[in-house]
Amino acid sequence: MQRDFAALLEACRRGGVEVRSDSRVVGQGDIFVAVPGVNEDGARFIPAAVEAGAAVVVCRPGGPEDAALQASVRAEGCRVVYHEDPREALWRLAEARWRTGASRVKILGVTGTNGKTTSTSLLERLFTDAGHKVGVLGTVSYRWPGHSEAAPLTTPDPLRVHSMLAQMEAAGVDVVVMEVSSHAIDQQRVCGVPFAGAAFTNLTQDHLDFHKDMESYFKTKARLFLELPRAE
């Protein structure tokens, strides 16, 4: 299992292969990662991804879909690579595909219940006035010089995070300021991002439907500082 996944990572590093977690955008030869979601399990969409041309499906082993999965995949000439944590698999593949682990861009994360958007906007202005080319990923928009788009999520999924970081670097951006939500930390959306620094604005009662209690909420926020990789 580890050897098969390592081969996928190497294929992504070489380029020429795309990674998807949405079966609706899968194309011929893509890698589809069946990520378990809050409301839907990505494993449900494996047949659709295979039909769309996925060359490889990454999913959890031992799931109820295994028997039907193996039959349909083999019939279509696709193969299955198992991973105990598809969310981890997704960000590792994204990091390999876009080579963000070797990025020279300084990436700063801002987390907290309130004040993330204000803080990132202030940092954007400060770094811009200091002569830097700045990119921002946040609640209002994803933007950098020459590009701006509306933000459907405060922190996008790993494929979007890593692809946009690569686009920013290619555009000459040297500082990125990113809003990091607690949902994003919990769902591994910013794992593999080589943060150079981070800021914690505050912690007040919010999102307890997701985190259950304030202690869990705090521990999730703290992971940005305790667990995520750091640039040297």
Positions of PLM-derived features:
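Phosphate-binding loop of NTP-binding sites
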Residues: 88-232
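N-terminal leader/targeting and accessory segments in enzymes
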Residues: 1-92
